[in-house]
Structures are given as structure tokens and as C-alpha cells.
Amino acid sequence: MVVLSYLKNQNKHFNAIKNQQITIAAKANIVICIAFCLFWTIYFSFAEMWFIVCTDIFFTTMSIFSLFLIYIHRISAGILVSQIVLFVFPVVFCLIFDVATIDHPRVAHLFLPAGAILGYLNYRRDPNALQLILIILSIAAFIFFSGSAFTLDGAIPLAESIRAYGGWIAISVATLMICISIFVMQLELQIENKLVQDLRLALSKQQFELFYQPQVNSCEKIIGAEILLR
């Protein structure tokens, strides 16, 4: 049927647009994450806090690797790696470095929703169990760290002087990443609604016409009819 062919072509077109949009969102979030980690790597290097420096270098390397995967068109794998980074990075910092105090609350857990939303966008285009597990874990960890001051016994709290401005930087970066993902999600919804709107508009304007095309056998005898909607 002509309509089915139209729908298939439109779906391919919309899927290509959605893939492009989620790729842009993933690249933007990963680049922001890399810049954030590099900033603190340099800062803590001057402060000679080598344990945090090594941690930041590891997460920066993983983020660069995820960006590389996306550039070679392994989009799902790249986003999955970046989602792992956006899960492990906040959890490690919440347990070891980002210890809540009376003057400064914990902020590292704010990166967890960014990873969950990015993972959800990827799950919509390429569902898999690991992606879903990471989304659930990210949400659960965000809830846990939001309502708890739990840290490890051997935690190494950051100095109050660092947290005074570092917290605002982390909040701003996490919020920016969340906003980017939400914006792309909104664009996806608009794309999906566009096809529905086109069909409704065509129906309201009575632009569809019904045709009957005869079906014949080898003896050229009519044995039925094919209904076409144009």
C-alpha cells in the first residue's frame, strides 16, 4: 500500500534525525564531562592531591574512549560507556570525597540523573538489558545519596575552601548536562508527533482516496482485488 510505503519512508527519515540528535546530545555531554574532569585534574595536581588526580584521569580517559566510539559510529556502545562513567564517577565521589557538611551539601550525585536521561534516550533507540539496569541503578543511587549522608569510613573529605566554589561549578555543569538531554528528549517527542499530525491533517482534509486494483491469476481471470489507500 502507498500509505505503508510512505510511513516506512517517514520512519526511516525520523529515525535518522533522532540518531543525529542523540549523537549530538551524547557528544555535548561527554565533552562537558571531559572538560569538567580535566579542570579538576589540573586543579588537584597543583594541590598535590594525587589520589583524586588519578581518579579524574581514569574517568577522563573513559570519557574520551566513549567519544571515540561515537565518532566511529558505535553510538550505543559509546553512550553506554559514558553512562557507566556518569554512574561510577558520582558514586565514587559521594562515597569518598564529596562528604556533606553543615555548610555545604553533597553535589556529586546530581550527575546521576544526567546519565539516566542520556541512557533512556539511547534505550529508546536501541533497547538492551544493561542499559536498563544502569538507568535503574542511576535513579536508585540518586535517591539514596539525596536522602542520606552515607560515606565510607576511610573517606577523604574535600576542604571547605574547595567545596565553597567547587560545589557551584559541579551544580552548574550537572544542570547543563540534564538540560541538554531533556531538550533532545523534547525534540524526539516533536518528531514522533509530526508523523501523527501529518496523518491527522490528511484525514481532516480528506486527502486519502480509496482505490481497488483487480488481482488476476495466470489465466487473467479476476480472483480478487487489492485495496489501495493513496
Positions of the model-derived regions?
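Short, Lys/Arg-rich, polar N-terminal cytosolic tail immediately upstream
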Residues: 1-20
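Membrane-interface helix-boundary motifs at transmembrane edges
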Residues: 15-22, 68-82, 123-130, 219
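Hydrophobic transmembrane alpha-helices and their membrane-interface boundaries in multi-pass
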Residues: 28-103, 110-117
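Alpha-helical transmembrane segments and their interfaces in multipass membrane proteins
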Residues: 38-58, 99-105, 125-177
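Short helix-capping and inter-helix turn/linker motifs at the boundaries of alpha-helical repeat units
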Residues: 107-109, 190
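Juxtamembrane or sensor-core-proximal signal-transducing alpha helices
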Residues: 165-198
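Active-site core of bacterial EAL-family cyclic-dinucleotide phosphodiesterase domains
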Residues: 191-230
